Structures are given as structure tokens and as C-alpha cells.
Curated annotation (Swiss-Prot):
List of residues binding GTP: 19-26, 87-91, 141-144
Annotated Gene Ontology cellular component terms: cytosol
InterPro entries noted in UniProt: EF-G-like_DII (IPR053905), EFG_III/V (IPR035647), G_TR_CS (IPR031157), P-loop_NTPase (IPR027417), PrfC (IPR004548), RF3_C (IPR032090), RF3_dom_3_sf (IPR038467), RF3_GTP-bd (IPR041732)
Lineage: Bacteria, Pseudomonadati, Pseudomonadota, Betaproteobacteria, Neisseriales
Free-text function comment from the UniProt entry: Increases the formation of ribosomal termination complexes and stimulates activities of RF-1 and RF-2. It binds guanine nucleotides and has strong preference for UGA stop codons. It may interact directly with the ribosome. The stimulation of RF-1 and RF-2 is significantly reduced by GTP and GDP, but not by GMP.
Pfam family, one: RF3_C
UniProt protein name: Peptide chain release factor 3
Subcellular location, record wording: Cytoplasm
SUPFAM superfamilies: EF-G C-terminal domain-like (SSF54980), P-loop containing nucleoside triphosphate hydrolases (SSF52540), Translation proteins (SSF50447)
């Protein structure tokens, strides 16, 4: 271990933003970049002419619909730290891609629409974070509007999400009467003014909740605030760093992302409290972030980030050591050495060549089809990082094309989209039609649009009478062959070459499992691990 690597690892913070759709996640992403100095005004990257679309929403379908469909990666410096921010799809139909992104972070920022409280997608995503005890910071957004009672919101988070809340700031009013927040730990009041371009130093601060100036500023509100703070301090949890790092307690902040209010406090908490890169599990051993040798894993593949180049980028989370441009690294699944000369880092779709990267950083490797999600890279050691799952799809469609001459383009397009995780592709063992599996309907719309725009293929999706999929495996090859022969009509091969059972309904799946006790039916499978 070198002191240089240790110092660089300590400076890193890698986190994702998770939320239900429309809670204000993309707005918050923009504002974090604005406050860090990474961009000059929300929606435009510093020095680049990117139009008026959000920095992190770069795919055409995202621009049309105003949702984050793909996960983007943004790196910026703040307070002598390097921050890697992973923006995740907020739309409920994109949970599988979001799950995978959560395997590449060390902490998460949960955004809640304070008018609505805890919503379905938030519950799913927090459950994924809980699998890895990921520390969570919470931001209650939209206090410039009429919202629900703040104590009620804390109770809801604790009861539904089963994580204890420690309010760090507390709101003064809401909607038209929103005056600001009181910072409980700092004993300061930050005064709210509407306006999306206001920067941190432009908000007024009053020191001390007993400051006489507050009677002049808020003659009607100040006594209620003091009473509320007394109640909150008596009834809620104090912030405890160890409990936060264990994923048991979440610090809670209140504000209005669209008005830049409450953003700096969140950034400071992520720098001061969130963990630096942590050790990662691999099949042979635990890999420490400050080891001398480079290693990392692929958690996402994005096709055609640059429409002009029609390329694919594999997103790699660095787990240990130091990456240097031009170094040789081994692609372990196929046992091939590659010279990493054109590796990039991101500000959404704006790319810069990487000279060096450390644990916690996300780098992009140009991919011509050899790299898959879950692949591990090292300087030679046979490491395979674990914990990057595929989830069983919930919706299925058969796919056909209007122009049979374009069958090769269809197959190529679906292969690429399958590899990047936009959709799961199954080739039935009997029958010609390919079957697509997804977590939500919008994924099929995205695939239709991308097949047309990127591959020139007009595809038609028909409903498929499939209830769910299970990957199957068996140690006894003879038994597996018998199972395949008896169930050929329900079996398919996925994009990774794995055998899957496509069940028409719940009863069928249950009966099949009973009839074949030696066959293991898996609801998830590890990426790049052949069952």
C-alpha cells in the first residue's frame, strides 16, 4: 500500500441518488453540480453548449419524456474531495438498472417529495440498499410548496422503511410561508428566498435559536419553531455517525432543490459523514481499496452514448489500487489482456480521457462487444467480484419485425441492449420468436425507440403468455438433460447463455418445482456467473 493511494481513497465519496419518480431527483443532481462549481447554471455543463436539457438526462427518449432512463455518472471536486455521483433512473419501470447502480456506490442520497411521503419505488430501492447496509442521507424536498406535517413524514420513513431518522435541519413553515430551516447541530437558522440561481453564500444565516433578531424577523413563527425544536429533540434520534455508517440511522435534511435551498448542507454531510470506498467481496477474498494493485468490476454497459460514434461504453467501478492510462489490465472472464489507452470519465455525456483513477472512481472503457455486466478486471490476479445480480423479469413480450430482411440488425440490437441491461432477452428452445423480459412497460417503449433510432429496425411487440422466469441449474447433468427434454416448450437461453424456465403462471411454476426437486430455480443470477 502506498501513502498516495491511501490519501486518494480517503478523499473519494461515491454515492447514488434514489427516489420515486418526480420527487425532484434530477433537479437535485443539477443543483449539487451547481453548488460544487462543476457547472455554471443548472442544465448546462461549464464551457459546453449542451442545450437546455438537464446535464444527466442525455438520451432522446429522456429528453422527450423528462425522465432519467439511463444511469449517468458525474465526477466533481468539492472541499478537497473527489465526488462520484451516479444518477439513477427515477421512473418506476427502471428499477433493475437502478439496482445494479447501487452495487457500485458506498452511500446513497434518498429524495422524498414531502407532499407525498414514502412512495413505492423508494421502498424497493431502500430494500436493495439494505442488502448491503448502504448508509443513507435523506432529503425532504419541495418545502416551497404545501407539504405534509414534518413529524408525520419522519414517522412514515421510520415505520415503512424501517430506518431510524435523525433530523439535522428542521423547516420553518412551508409553501408561501416557508421561511427557512434551523440547523439543529450548528444552532443556525438559514433564511429562505425563492430563486433557482442563488448560491450558498447568498442565503442569510442567523446564529442561535434564542437570537433576539428572530423575534423581529418572524414574530408569528418563532415561538412555534422553538416549541417544535424542543419536541423534535425530545422525541427523535440524535445523529450518531456509527449508526449512520451501519445503515441503521439516516440524517434528515429539509429544503427546496429547485430553489437551491438545503443543497449545501447535503453536500457537506456527504463529505463529512459518508464513507470513503469500502472493501469489496470477490470469490477468492475480500479486496481492500488501498491495495497497490488495480482491480474493478463492470456494473453497467451503455450503448451509443455518442450518436455520432455508435459506440458502447462499459462503466467500471475501481475497487483497489491505481488505474493509469495505457496500463495493461486483464479482462478475467475471457483471460485477455487489454491496454487501456482510451478510458474516459464523465460529466454525463461529455467525456474526458482519464489519466488516473482510484478506488471509488467510475471509469468508462470503450467496448466493442467483449465486455459484459459483472466482468472483473485486474492487473493479473484471478478475482471475480460478486453481488451484481440479474432480477427475474415481471413482464414479457415476443418480438417480431416488419421487414424480415432486417433480422440481423434486430438480433444485433437486442444483443447489445440485453448486454447493457436495458432489457432481458430470451431465445426459446422451441419457436422462432425472441422473448423480451422487463421490470416495467416503459422498458419496452425504450427498446422500441432505440431499435428504430440506433439500428434502423421497426419492431413489433406482442404479449407473451409468460408469468415469470426462473434461471435453472442442477449438479446432476443427467437429471438436467431429462428436465430439458420434458420441458423444452418452456425453456429458453438468455443473453448470457443461461438456461431459464418461462412459467405461464404461478401454479405451473409451483407444480414444476414439485415434480423436479433436484432442479434449482433461481429468482436472481449473478452477472457473468454461468449457472
Amino acid at each position: 500500500m502506498s501513502q498516495e493511494i491511501l490519501d486518494q481513497v480517503r478523499r473519494r465519496r461515491t454515492f447514488a441518488i434514489i427516489s420515486h419518480p418526480d420527487a425532484g431527483k434530477t433537479t437535485l443532481t443539477e443543483k449539487l453540480l451547481l453548488f460544487s462549481g462543476a457547472i455554471q447554471s443548472a442544465g448546462t455543463v461549464k464551457g459546453k453548449k449542451t442545450g437546455k436539457f438537464a446535464t444527466s438526462d442525455w438520451m432522446d427518449i429522456e429528453k422527450q419524456r423528462g425522465i432519467s432512463v439511463a444511469s449517468s455518472v458525474m465526477q466533481f471536486d468539492y472541499k478537497d474531495h473527489t465526488v462520484n455521483l451516479l444518477d439513477t433512473p427515477g421512473h418506476q419501470d427502471f428499477s433493475e438498472d437502478t439496482y445494479r447502480v447501487l452495487t457500485a456506490v458506498d452511500s446513497a442520497l434518498m429524495v422524498i417529495d414531502a407532499a407525498k411521503g414514502v412512495e413505492a419505488q423508494t421502498i424497493k430501492l431502500l430494500n436493495v440498499c439494505r442488502l448491503r447496509d448502504t448508509p443513507i442521507v435523506t432529503f425532504m424536498n419541495k418545502y416551497d410548496r404545501e407539504v405534509r406535517d414534518s413529524l408525520e413524514l419522519l414517522d412514515e420513513v421510520e415505520n415503512i422503511l424501517q430506518i431510524r431518522c435523525a433530523p439535522v435541519t428542521w423547516p420553518i413553515g412551508m409553501g408561501k410561508n416557508f421561511k427557512g430551516v434551523y440547523h439543529i447541530l450548528n444552532d443556525e437558522i438559514y433564511l429562505f428566498e425563492a430563486g433557482g440561481e442563488r448560491l450558498p453564500h447568498e442565503f442569510d444565516i442567523i446564529k442561535g435559536i434564542d437570537n433576539p433578531e428572530l423575534e423581529q424577523r418572524f414574530p408569528l413563527e418563532i415561538q412555534q419553531l422553538r416549541d417544535e425544536i424542543e419536541l423534535v429533540q425530545a422525541a427523535s434520534n440524535e445523529f450518531n455517525l456509527d449508526e449512520f455508517l451501519a445503515g441503521e440511522l439516516t440524517p434528515v435534511f429539509f429544503g427546496s432543490a429547485i430553489n437551491n435551498f438545503g443543497i449545501q448542507e447535503i453536500l457537506n454531510s456527504l463529505i463529512d459523514w459518508a464513507p470513503a470506498p469500502k472493501p469489496r467481496d470477490a470469490t477468492v477474498r475480500m479486496v481492500e481499496p488501498d491495495e497497490a494493485k488495480f482491480s474493478g468490476f463492470i456494473f453497467k454497459i451503455q450503448a451509443n452514448m455518442d450518436p455520432k460514434h455508435r459506440d458502447r461504453i462499459a462503466f467500471l467501478r475501481v475497487c483497489s489500487g491505481k488505474f493509469e492510462r495505457g496500463m495493461k489490465m486483464k479482462h478475467l472472464r475471457i483471460n485477455r489482456e487489454i491496454a487501456a489507452s482510451s478510458v474516459v470519465t464523465f460529466m454525463s455525456h461529455d467525456r474526458e480521457l482519464v489519466e488516473e483513477a482510484y478506488a471509488g472512481d467510475i471509469i468508462g472503457i470503450p467496448n466493442h462487444g467483449n465486455i459484459q455486466i459483472g466482468d472483473s478486471f485486474s492487473e493479473g490476479e484471478q478475482l471475480a467480484f460478486t453481488g451484481i445480480p440479474f432480477f427475474a423479469p415481471e413482464l414479457f413480450r415476443s418480438v417480431r419485425i416488419k421487414n424480415p430482411l432486417k433480422i440481423k440488425q434486430l438480433q444485433k440490437g437486442l444483443q447489445q441492449l440485453g448486454e447493457e441491461g436495458a432489457v432481458q432477452v430470451f431465445k426459446p428452445m422451441s419457436g422462432a420468436d425472441l422473448i423480451l423480459g422487463a421490470v416495467g412497460v416503459l422498458q419496452f417503449e425504450v427498446v422500441t425507440s432505440r431499435l428504430a433510432n440506433e439500428y434502423g429496425v421497426e419492431a413489433v411487440f406482442d404479449s407473451a403468455s409468460i408469468w415469470s422466469a426462473r434461471w435453472v441449474s442442477c449438479d446432476d447433468k443427467k437429471k438436467l438433460a431429462e428436465f430439458e427434454k420434458a420441458n423444452a416448450g418452456n425453456l429458453a437461453i438468455d443473453a448470457g447463455g443461461n438456461l431459464a424456465y418461462l412459467a405461464p403462471n404461478r401454479v405451473n411454476l409451483g407444480l414444476t418445482q414439485e415434480r423436479w426437486p433436484d432442479i434449482v430455480f433461481h429468482e436472481t443470477r449473478e452477472h457473468s456467473v454461468k449457472l
